[in-house]
Structures are given as structure tokens and as C-alpha cells.
């Protein structure tokens, strides 16, 4: 039902066939380049003198004020995942059946979405907030909610640990098997061995037990995008309160500025990448068949409790 608007209306259908309206395969949205705005606002401007002085003491005349459109970035993003990632990511491997079936066959309805770039994940959250939740809430006379978004790296790790601060894995303990010898996640146990854990590629999202927060697949199956930009030294300078390091890289920025943190490990990774503290990266404009995402909402606070049961 959520994708009904993607198809031609009945009046435009040919022989009553349900077909995708290709004009709607792109999603357009806008965001503000806060870093550029901050850099501009940080200059020591002397408007009375008709110029400004930078941090080096150099004086410049103001040629005219640029309007806010300079800081508003327009993004046009493909709606559908890259179906060819199953072939591109594994050369000399027979993954054509996954390419042909994974993104449309009902057998994969409960499998994680993959083949989505970091930019597409953000665009989905914008669409979900504006066109689904807030539009519906406004129609019901309810207040808006915070935007759906990708979790920060710190939020993801906190959720992954499930309250077990000293455990290397979301399920607790230092082992990746339970007492019966069964693997506790979908990953690559040994070289050339993808099936001992019960899955060859991805598996349904509820195939393994959740952590103590009730969250599934915080380790294995598919790795997950976070909102955090990747920097090897980020732990040396980020804050201890809701730490986050972000950088909105533009299309012409170098690749090193387009790195985004991924967490959790996937079906193709060894056990190290399933640990809650292991971090890796991928480029924001790159889609992979082993990377997905999950959306989060910032907590709004608790309303006044009526009785003890509401606490």
C-alpha cells in the first residue's frame, strides 16, 4: 500500500496491467549545508565598514549578500535498490538468481533490504517522515514527531550491546555458539564456509534470537549504515555526551570525505566484524548486497503518568 502511488493510475493503465510509473523512480528532497553556513557565520564581519576581516587579519570588501539558497542542497535519489549488487560484489560467483528474485519475490518479504546507498537510506527516512508519519499525524490532528533518521555510531553500539556493557557480542559472552554448538548469528564461520550457521546469503530477520533490548540482527546477516562519518581518530576528539562526528560530503568531495561508518558485520564477514565494538566503513554513494539499514527516532520524553501502570 505504501508504494501504491508508484504505479500508473487505473486511467493510465494499458490493458489494466499494473506498471511502475518511471517518472516516480527518483525522490527529490532538500537539506541545508550547515558546515558552509557555520564557516560563513564565523567570519568577523564589519558591515558598517562594508567589509569583513578573517582570522588572519586580512580585509575584504563585501560584494553582496548571498541568499539562503546557497546553503540549500537539492538531492535527487533513485528510489529502488541496486539489484545488480549481488553480481558486482562477488566476481566469478553464481548469484544471478539472487539478482533476479531478491527484490521482488514474496519469498524474500521478511529478508533485509540491501543494495541501498547511505544517501538512499537518508532519502527514505525523509520520505518516511514527511509523506508517511507527519502527513498522517497532521490529518489526525496529532503533533509531529521527530524525524526518522539513521542511528549515530554511538547509538547503534549502545543498542547492539543490549545493556551488556562488557560483552563483545549482542547476545552476551565471548562465544559465537550456544551450549548446543549452534551459531548465534549469520556470518562466515570459516574460509569458504557460509552455511554452517544456517544461512548461505541473507536470512529472514527473525532467524536468530534478539538481544536483551529485543533487537534482531544487531550482529550478522547484513551490516548497517550509521549517520556517522568515518575517521580513524574520532575517539580522540568526539564528545562524551551523545558523541557524533558528521560530514555532509558533496558530489565533488574526495572519496576520503565520503566514508560512513557501518556496523554489525554481515553474512560474508568473519566473527570479528560481529563484535559490538568493531567499526568499518563504506562510501556514501556505494551500494552493497551485504549492507542494509534501520531507522531510529529521537526520544521525545515521557508524558504525565496517570497511574503506576503507565510508568
Q: Residue spans of the language-model regions?
A:
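Low-complexity, serine/threonine/proline-enriched polar segments
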Residues: 2-43, 47
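Functional-site microenvironments in short loops/helix caps that host divalent-cation chemistry
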Residues: 13, 31, 40-43, 50, ...
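Extended, hydrophobic interaction surfaces within ordered domains
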Residues: 275, 282, 293-295
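C-terminal beta-signal and terminal closure region of outer-membrane beta-barrel proteins
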Residues: 283-287
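Short, structured beta-strand segments at or near domain termini in extracellular proteins/domains
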Residues: 289-305
